[in-house]
Amino acid sequence: MIFSQGASPLKGEFSRIKFSIASPESILAHSRGEVLKPETINYRTFKPERDGLMCEKIFGPTKDWECYCGKYKRVRYKGIICDRCGVEVTTKSVRRERMGHIALAVPVVHTWFFRSVPSKIGALLDLSTKELERIIYYEVYVVINPGEPGEKQGIKKLDRLTEEQYFQIITEYEDNQDLEDSDPDKFVAKMGGEAIHMLLKNIDLDASAIHLRKVLKESNSEQKRADALKRLKVVEAFRKSYEPHKKTRKKPQGLFPEDELPEPYVYEGNKPEYMVMEVVPVIPPELRPLVPLEGGRFATSDLNDLYRRVIIRNNRLKKLIDIRAPEVILRNEKRMLQEAVDALFDNSRKANAVKTGESNRPLKSLSDALKGKQGRFRQNLLGKRVDYSGRSVIVVGPELKLHECGLPKSMAIELFQPFVIRRLVDRGIAKSVKSAKKLIDKKDPIVWDVLEKVIDGRPVLLNRAPTLHRLGIQAFQPLLIEGKAIQIHPLVCTAFNADFDGDQMAVHIPLSQEAQLEASLLMLSSHNLILPQSGKPVTVPSQDMVLGMYYLTKSRSRDLGEGQIFYSPQDVLIAYNEERVGLHAQIFVQYDGEIDQKFDSLRVLDTMTDLTAEKSAWLKAQIEKKCILLTTVGRVIFNQNVPKEIGFINRVIDKKVAKELIGRLSSEVGNVETAKFLDNIKEVGFHYAMKGGLSVGLSDAIVPETKARHIKSAQRDSTKVVKEYNRGTLTDNERYNQIVDVWQKTSNIVAEESYQKLKKDRDGFNPLYMMLDSGARGSREQVRQLTGMRGLIARPQKSMSGQPGEIIENPIISNLKEGLTVLEYFISTHGARKGLSDTSLKTADAGYLTRRLHDVAQDVIVTIDDCGTTRGLYVHRNIEEETSGQIKFREKIKGRVAARDIIDTLNNNVIVNSGEIITEELAELIQETAGVEEAEIRSVLTCESKIGICSKCYGTNLSVHELVEIGEAVGVIAAQSIGEPGTQLTLRTFHQGGTAQGGISETETKAFYDGQIQFEDIKTVEHTAINEDGVADLRIIVIQKNGKINIADPESGKILKRYLVPHGAHLHCKNGSLVKKDQVMFSSEPNSTQIIAEIPGIIKFADIEKGITYKEEVDPQTGFSQHTIINWRSKLRATETREPRLMIIDASGEVRKTYPVPIKSNLYVEDGQKVEPGDIMAKVPRNLDRVGGDITAGLPKVTELFEARIPTDPAIVTEIDGYVSFGSQRRSSKEIKVKNDFGEEKVYYVQVGKHVLANEGDEVKAGDPLTDGAVSPQDILRIQGPNAVQQYLVNEIQKVYQINAGVEINDKHLEVIVRQMLQKVRVEEPGDTDLLPGDLIDRSAFVESNQSVAEKVRITEKGDAPARIQDSQLHKVRDITKLNRELRKNSKNMIAFEPALQATSHPVLLGITSAALQTESVISAASFQETTKVLTDAAVAGKVDYLAGLKENVIVGKLIPAGTGLKRYKAIKLTGEGQESNATERVVEEPATREGFANER
């Protein structure tokens, strides 16, 4: 932005900001004068020195309306320039705006353009950074014009010469030096900034671009093409910075009031020589202040020191030039000046940075002022301090309403002081502001009355740090309270993640009318009951409230008055108040409203022993007719608070039921009723928790008597395992895994029994059990440790990369009630301490993940209603996922818009029409309809909006259950929804004390449904084995990998569930047979992969040599030897190679089948041994992830997926469908070939020792892994396309959150982020567009580039066309056809042409960090990371920031373009009744009514 001399800075509207390199002219245009002296202030007078760094003449007066010498004082002399001291009489605030300059004695290279990677200057001149450095720092001369002497000596332009070579030429050709510098025959070589300046000035960008494009097309050398491309990018950036200005000399719109720029400032684009500075700008003195300290010393900004060095060296150099000092001295001084300017602009890049005298730290340069957390962007522009705010400790306010908070009087009077003063003066209570202040200080009683009136209807905002999602700031209506702590409603604690152990909260006051309205309409706590991340309620009762409701609604048999029949709920209450009936008694009530059907009244009726058969039969009939209700007194009391529309809730109310109920209320009766209900159940909950007197004593933790028996049995089992190991039938790995399994099972059995014991104790009224069962406090895991056994403990890992933790195989048999032995205690401290240290370390990681997510998605805003796409996303029903507790089918489709009709295939009924929202009811219906296997829904991933996304593709806004409005910042909501639970994830291990759980390796797989078995791709062999009792046992063993067993419905043939059958599994069912639910279908060994003989024959070892490819380990305890394949590479010479494999040969010695054996395999056969089909020849051990609850694996996993990193040991994936064959073996790798029926073949090289999953002859599909390891998302994108990788990322991230933390995040949030990761494409062939090969550009920009050449042709032969038409040019088809018509008419040669070629590209998957840095907005990218690099690139290319996202608008201080800040709300007309107001330029003027504003919104 350019301000003319004397004009004040831009106050008006601007819509975009352009970045470019400052030319010397523009620096001088900004400047108010040259800084000539390094002095700042006079040490005696403390006044700024004239012409120094603080000079008043240049930068403006230090006192308002007063010149330096004091001749002019007072405002009446405004604008006069003093004739004595030359200072303009104005306000001192101009010292924040006015700039100066330093005129350099020699040109100096700007370090940003020289040191950036790749170096901009280096790319233009085709010099390496090392060579450039030698020229710039005056070590060598560079030839600018070889002239005649150069030609004779064979010297070319840009050659580097040493001092001797240079002087040799100069002395040899003395006459040559008399020629003018512009003479082409003169030999010119220079060094330093001057040389670079001349070279850059002489560059012809257009010619360079043509030459480099030619190299790209014609060169065969890969290196040359890569270099040319790197250079071309910089050349094109400079050329593009010219383009917009070639056509018009008008200014970019909105910067200046006039139509034209003032003449000197016509922007001509960047010239390369601007990268070398002749003038250095000096920033305003208020931005680098001198602050007086006590003791007469001054604290100064580092910039002043850096400027001082530049000025001192510059002045010294000028003097030396004047006195014609020797070249050596000059050169040294010039080099020092270059270094001083380098340090001023960027002091952190250099190894020898300028340090301060006393503390020896590097000085903060201009770059450092922008960079990092403490830089200008993040510290001051994105993180401003707020006035009208205060903070205090929070305490609970149980008597508050949901929308209220208690504000201490002392805080309120301070915050609302200006408003109170105004009221006091207006009402005549105080004469002046001063006297009003006195009244307030005296705490006059009238002040409190006024304060009450002032705060009436004025919301305040409460915020608790860290603000992880939007519910971390909510609005409340304040109530004045005594004391010094803020009171908050207990139900909003969950949203703030607050508790009352000393947490503090900040209060902010919305000042403007608009802010107050937005606070009370959008941010009021009673309007924010639903969590945006999942659409589930967030204001859910917890702890005491849950316990109270649970206690109230629980039934107890034989309580006072059981079996009585009441005429109405009112009668029940009267009887209870008269103590005729107990709180938990089961009674009958006549009820005519809706009834919640989840309670099995008839079953309970059968358990009531005191009823006669006759009475029982009558009651049964009445219950079935729904005239009478079997319930408890407590439930009647509870239902007094439930709105009639919901009906009678006849269940025990625990946390889960309460959450469900609040969710129903908010969608069925609205927020107002729900808020009332919440306040009522809060009262009820606290009241009955108090009445129940529920507290835990040691005797409530009951240890089951059977515990000792189970432990004995487990000890027997583990002894048996050890015996087998000693016999040599198990490897050490298998022994470990089996022992862990035994203890895991035992621990679970004991836990279940202790749980059942608690449940039966005192009729289910054991306080410990009630707390657990209601969900008030504690988990089954904690009860297991209290009353069962602590079980196995995880051994903490050293690394944080998230491999599965080892488990210590000695379990802790005691529980916490019995107390631990010293050894057990010592083992368990391990896990507990890790939990605490993890917590603190990992919170930072989660915070950084959130920041990256915000940055990548901050500009995703709903911009249009419907993008009109025909594409959608297919969602399949997956029973396996649903049973393992993952997200149900209905949750995935709820709140989305159907892309196609959803049809019930069984009867062809349309359930949902295309374009219709799938509501909760419809989703439930689809879930229940067996005929719907999949649905196609609109998704953000397939949205085709140019900017932002459309509301149809996003679906409903989860927090209001309606289609998302235009202007909703869905990107930020998505980032918060993923980041907030990320921070929760980190704290997971903390509460479990690091005990190991989960991960019992399931050896038997049971049927989930009744149905018919169908085999798919299953090959088997029969095998007879001798079992433990010495009896022969016939087994059917699967020898095919990736076989499946399907359970189908015998009538319709529809597949209900699919099971993957592992290689080596034993089948317990036949193809086509019927199975019952829970019948075992097959069993497998989970701890290892087996290599199984498929045919009979004799084993022959190939390349299996003792000490080279296998080692023999004799177990010291058992004396048995075990053969393990080892990595043989270190044992052999470089040329030698081995490939360990087992071969089966027949009697004639012919090889029938070969099996490669991976490293770490244990051999179970000897050379020459006879084998039968089904015999195990070798086992490859597997690592099982057994440690549950430790999210260390979770967060790094999420980060890895979001950053689209290639896994450490990725699987090799086939790119085509086909059949597998093995090729030759090399020293370190072997070949796997995949060939299809069309003769296409792909060869993959697999590292030796990597486990190959495919066998010779296996059929594979594109995208199938051929080896062990995780599949890389980049491979999925390359082979299966963008859709597959999007689905993969969303599902994998969901799994981590689901399994590791049980956190529910709606898919649409993940889709928003994944969409941002796939926004870019990489250009492959640019065709005739102006793109470059390898360019990374936005998909929409790529489409635009192709459209620009769509109707153009390239001239191949110009014929007799006019001179303006040349070969290879692009022209519009219609222009050329018109010309050709004329040429034909005149019988001339016509123009030959061909259609212009369009560019080709492939999609790119970027990690969130790269995606955030690649964003279109310069300001947003610069404030994220790598600030200097982003700004350098933007300046060279003359980029324009159109301020489309949220972040850039916050930085420049505008309203964000989301919500009420949208452009469409700029000129709202507000009308009261019977009056017409003018359109305002602000968002709102004075609203006539609140309702009016709400309707407008």
Swiss-Prot record:
Which residues are involved in binding Zn(2+) 1? 67, 69, 82, 85
Cofactor(s) required for function per UniProt: Mg(2+); Zn(2+)
Top-level taxonomic group: Bacteria
Gene3D superfamilies listed in its UniProt record: 1.10.132.30, 1.10.150.390, 1.10.1790.20, 1.10.40.90, 2.40.40.20, 2.40.50.100, RNA polymerase II, clamp domain, RNA polymerase Rpb1, domain 3
Q: Which CDD domains does the entry link to?
A: RNAP_beta'_C (cd02655), RNAP_beta'_N (cd01609)
The cross-references to SUPFAM superfamilies, in alphabetical order and at most eight, read: beta and beta-prime subunits of DNA dependent RNA-polymerase (SSF64484)
Give the cofactor note: Binds 1 Mg(2+) ion per subunit.
Q: Which residues bind Mg(2+)?
A: 499, 501, 503
Q: Which GO CC terms are listed, alphabetically?
A: DNA-directed RNA polymerase complex
Its BP terms in the Gene Ontology are: DNA-templated transcription
**Binding residue positions for Zn(2+) 2:** 867, 943, 950, 953
Reactions accelerated catalytically? RNA(n) + a ribonucleoside 5'-triphosphate = RNA(n+1) + diphosphate
InterPro entries the record matches: DNA-dir_RpoC_beta_prime, DNA-dir_RpoC_beta_prime_bact, RNA_pol_asu, RNA_pol_N, RNA_pol_Rpb1_1, RNA_pol_Rpb1_3, RNA_pol_Rpb1_3_sf, RNA_pol_Rpb1_4
Disulfide bond annotation, renumbered to this chain: none
Entry's EC annotation: 2.7.7.6
Q: What class of enzyme is it?
A: transferase
Q: Basic and acidic residues composition bias: which ranges?
A: 1482-1497
Q: Where is this region: Disordered?
A: 1476-1497
UniProt-recorded Gene Ontology molecular function terms? DNA binding; DNA-directed RNA polymerase activity; magnesium ion binding; zinc ion binding
Which UniProt key words apply to this protein?
Answer: DNA-directed RNA polymerase, Magnesium, Metal-binding, Nucleotidyltransferase, Transcription, Transferase, Zinc
Q: Which Pfam families match?
A: RNA_pol_Rpb1_1, RNA_pol_Rpb1_2, RNA_pol_Rpb1_3, RNA_pol_Rpb1_4, RNA_pol_Rpb1_5
Family according to the record: Belongs to the RNA polymerase beta' chain family.
Q: What binding partners and quaternary form does the record give?
A: The RNAP catalytic core consists of 2 alpha, 1 beta, 1 beta' and 1 omega subunit. When a sigma factor is associated with the core the holoenzyme is formed, which can initiate transcription.
Per its database record, what is this protein's job?
Answer: DNA-dependent RNA polymerase catalyzes the transcription of DNA into RNA using the four ribonucleoside triphosphates as substrates.
Q: From the Swiss-Prot or TrEMBL record, give the protein name.
A: DNA-directed RNA polymerase subunit beta'
